[in-house]
Amino acid sequence: MNIVVITGASSGMGREFAMQLDRGLHSVDEFWLIARRGSRLKEIASSMQHTVKILPLDLTNEADMTVLTESLAEEKPVVRMLINCAGYGMMGDFTAVPIKEQTGEVDLNCRALLEVTYGCLPYMRAKSRIIQLASSAAFLPQPGFSVYAATKSFVLSFSKALRAELKERQIYVTAVAWTGKQNFSKWRSTMHPRLR
């Protein structure tokens, strides 16, 4: 069974990847959609043509990560494509945002991405692809967005190194450094409450 695994699939770029690939990718049997909001995943799955496995998981939670790795071990699919879109960014000066929120950002944007990639790689074959959602923030440190920019620099650097490591196996790695849409309401909603 050939599958596509998408993290952060309940909204944003993750949702968009799922919808676009569902229409245009005919060489896979199933999509595995991962996000915390299971109800949103069900809505998305209902509008897709492919079979969808819904995995309502918090990737910063060790037990939830185990659900993913155990599902892979049990079903032994061929992961044709892994798309890591799960992530978020908190706006605000470093000392103004509580440290727990910032370490949570690092956990999801970096550690979870590493763990999902590590868990999926044994099930990838030649011509499989890994797409990591970085950001244009990876290229430029940003005051007021410092932790987010640092996590995206990590994603970019990790992706470049992994691409070189996997080249002989013909597993392709792409880091997408998108700029995002400028939507003030959305950006404002990510700001720490004291800065809104």
Regions found by a protein language model. Give the residues of each.
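Substrate-binding pocket helix/loop in short-chain dehydrogenase/reductase
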Residues: 93-94, 98-106
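Conserved glycine-rich cofactor-binding loop
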Residues: 10-11
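Conserved glycine-rich Rossmann-like NAD(P)H-binding loop of the short-chain dehydrogenase/reductase
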Residues: 25-43
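Conserved NAD(P)H cofactor-binding loop of Rossmann-fold oxidoreductase domains
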Residues: 85-90
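Residue(s) in the substrate-gating loop at a strand-loop-helix junction
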Residues: 135
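Active-site helix of classical SDR
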Residues: 117, 151
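SDR active-site lid
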Residues: 164, 168-196
